[in-house]
């Protein structure tokens, strides 16, 4: 199957594209786009991969589901398009960056600038029906994104994996802590941010680790 995804990822994930689950997933997603309003727009489904080639990945942040409101999702977890109000979790992420690094709250919630520096902003599920959170879960996306995380964890070294909340922590449970830095805390959602997300200093800790391993820090 010829999947429109960045070339290095296409090579590393090629076995997945031929598996039965992925063929079924593709048929389901194609049908959904034809019959319902689906986010993100089709050209952005693999945006996280397209902006961040396999060998350029320094950091992986694992999200769960795309935003399901109009104009928000563009294929990067937690990120929104320019001009879109910050969802609460993103607002809290920026607050933690401000507290941790002293950086001002940005004017845009578009995290393409992180992706361009090697931050893979990967949702576990890559599509969703408008206004129906979780509507495309358990259709095969989770298996596909597990494969992407696994191939990174096995074939690369010294990546920072950031796991916020129990869902992301379960998804990243297999990552070898001797080869990579795994940072885990509560989720930035208002429901849990005060239970260990605020004050986790994940952004400074990421940069310290990258610099210790000869890599350029991220401009958060």
Curated annotation (Swiss-Prot):
The reaction(s) this protein catalyses: Hydrolyzes single-stranded DNA or mismatched double-stranded DNA and polynucleotides, releasing free uracil
Keywords: Cytoplasm, DNA damage, DNA repair, Hydrolase
Active site positions: 65 (proton acceptor)
Cellular-component GO terms for this entry: cytoplasm
Superkingdom: Bacteria
SUPFAM superfamilies: Uracil-DNA glycosylase-like
Enzyme Commission identifier(s): 3.2.2.27
Gene Ontology MF annotations: uracil DNA N-glycosylase activity
Subcellular location: Cytoplasm
GO biological processes: base-excision repair, AP site formation via deaminated base removal
Its biological purpose: Excises uracil residues from the DNA which can arise as a result of misincorporation of dUMP residues by DNA polymerase or due to deamination of cytosine.
The protein's name in its UniProt record: Uracil-DNA glycosylase
Organism (species): Phocaeicola vulgatus (strain ATCC 8482 / DSM 1447 / JCM 5826 / CCUG 4940 / NBRC 14291 / NCTC 11154) (Bacteroides vulgatus)
